[in-house]
Amino acid sequence: MSKGQSLQDPYLNILRKERVPVSIFLVNGIKLQGQIESFDQFVILLKNTVSQMVYKHAISTVVPSRTIRIPSPDQPEDDAE
């Protein structure tokens, strides 16, 4: 995993696993809302009434509806609770 992905992937994975509602703001100002269904290196699948594939290069900000605790790199995600 590249250094740039070391925070992004665990953060998105926690949001996905805990089904945290998120607001995603795109670079053009559009606000999308839903839950992260899955993601990869290039896209996020956002589910609300429909599923939307959102390209990461179009995303400005991801705002969770509640505070998220990100485990440290040497701490497994399951131990973070």
From Swiss-Prot:
Sm domain ranges (all copies): 9-68
SUPFAM superfamilies: Sm-like ribonucleoproteins
One Pfam family of this chain: Hfq
GO MF: RNA binding
InterPro entries linked: Hfq (IPR005001), LSM_dom_sf (IPR010920), Sm (IPR047575)
Keyword RNA-binding: yes
Entry annotated with the keyword RNA-binding: yes
One CC-aspect GO term: cytosol
Protein's GO biological process: regulation of DNA-templated transcription; regulation of RNA stability; regulation of translation, ncRNA-mediated
Keywords in alphabetical order: RNA-binding, Stress response
Biological role: RNA chaperone that binds small regulatory RNA (sRNAs) and mRNAs to facilitate mRNA translational regulation in response to envelope stress, environmental stress and changes in metabolite concentrations. Also binds with high specificity to tRNAs.
Subunit structure: Homohexamer.
NCBIfam families: Hfq, PRK00395.1
UniProt record similarity statement: Belongs to the Hfq family.
Protein name (Swiss-Prot/TrEMBL): RNA-binding protein Hfq
Gene label: hfq
